[in-house]
Design a protein with these regions (language model features):
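Helix-coil-helix junctions within alpha-helical repeat/solenoid scaffolds
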Residues: 4, 11-290, 294, 312-313, ...
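Helix-turn-helix DNA-binding segment
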Residues: 279, 285-357
């Protein structure tokens, strides 16, 4: 029964997985088998989380964690699952704390398998908390650990899309594309549809970072539709959120669908991200800068410089390009060096001078 449940979850058969694990949980409770009850509570919570039922998943995960603490059985695994549930539907700080606790225990035990899973939970919580650099650090370690363990099935941890997204946000789209390409090969071979949709969502962000707006919108729209058909409610909402961020923010309704979907999931930490995005105003659209000003800059540097010329703040640039404010600052430093200037004011003056000529 347990093996069949895992096979169903990895194969995106969420309704069947829920029915299977619910029956298993009912049976072990009837028999008073506490160790199995802790295990199957985690399984049911995981299924609900993947289905986008974040409130239900959080209740089950917390129940399982209490039982694990009381019995001394499966505490690390329960902490990892509860971390994912907290970061999705509860308190993201609690999610971070639980994941770090699980990482510490796995390191103390020398358990490489559990360490990779705990770091995966930590990386996800860091992404939700707005720390993409932390996500990159955690999930690069997961990649190294899984390679050392010979794990090639991306449905085991499902961290690859999050790593790619975080890499885009810290200004590393080339590495993000490499993660996507390598993972897609395995996902296609194994038929992991939800993983492929997550990779498409991340690849759309790579395209957006390269200025391929229309292609990014088309890929995100497709990814959202695939998640909806598979029944992955939270992932569908995340795709809608990414899509909204690419659209014209002067329309007050641009984030409405993402808000509706996250509310349906009871994904409170994600709703807070939407609220923050809504509060970032769209910079005014002005005439495009003279291309010659930006010759010699890399793609990301050109985009950042062009937005500076439009009058965008670093925070606004970060929101529009799906990168962190620190990445914007580092990119601007490179722009200053290449253009032989000292400040963002000089970029605007340089552009104005070229236009005057």
């Amino acid at each position: 029964g347990s093996a069949r449940f895992r096979w169903l979850v990895m194969g995106d058969q969420l309704a069947e997985a829920r029915a299977t694990v619910t029956a298993l949980l009912r049976e072990v409770r009837r028999r008073g088998q506490v160790e199995s009850e802790v295990h199957f509570l985690r399984g049911l919570a995981e299924t609900e989380l993947r289905s986008g039922h974040c409130g239900r998943a959080l209740d089950l995960a917390r129940e399982g964690l209490r039982l694990a603490h009381d019995s001394g059985i499966g505490e690390t695994a329960s902490a990892m699952l509860t971390s994912l549930a907290e970061a999705s539907g509860g308190d993201v700080d609690r999610g971070l704390a639980l994941a770090r606790e699980a990482v510490e225990h796995a390191e103390q035990d020398g358990d490489t398998m559990y360490l990779s899973r705990a770091l995966g939970a930590l990386g996800y919580a860091q992404l939700v908390a707005g720390d993409p650099a932390g996500t990159v650090r955690s999930l690069r370690r997961v990649r190294e650990l899984e390679q050392s363990l010979g794990i090639t099935d991306p449905a085991r941890g499902r961290w690859q899309g999050d790593l790619a997204e975080a890499l885009v946000r810290v200004g590393e789209p080339a590495e993000a594309q490499d993660v996507i390409d390598v993972t897609r090969e395995h996902a296609l071979r194994l038929g992991r549809e939800s993983v492929l949709a997550a990779l498409d969502r991340a690849e759309a962000l790579v395209r957006a970072a390269h200025g391929e707006h229309d292609a990014a919108v088309a890929q995100l729209t497709s990814a959202q539709d695939r998640f909806a058909k598979l029944g992955y409610g939270l992932e569908e909402a995340r795709a809608a959120f990414a899509l909204a961020a690419l659209r014209d923010r002067r329309s007050p309704a641009v984030f409405d669908e993402a808000t509706r979907l996250f509310r349906r999931c009871r994904a409170l930490p994600w709703l807070r991200q939407v609220d923050e995005a809504v509060s970032v105003p769209e910079p005014p659209v002005e005439a495009p800068a003279e291309p010659a000003v930006l010759d010699g800059l890399a793609a990301m540097e050109r985009q950042v410089a062009a937005l500076v010329m439009e009058g965008a703040t670093n925070r606004e640039i970060a929101a529009r390009l799906f990168i962190s404010v620190k990445t914007v600052e580092a990119t601007l430093t490179r722009v200053y060096r290449k253009l032989g200037i000292r400040s963002r004011v000089d970029i605007v003056r340089l552009a104005a001078g070229r236009r005057a000529k």
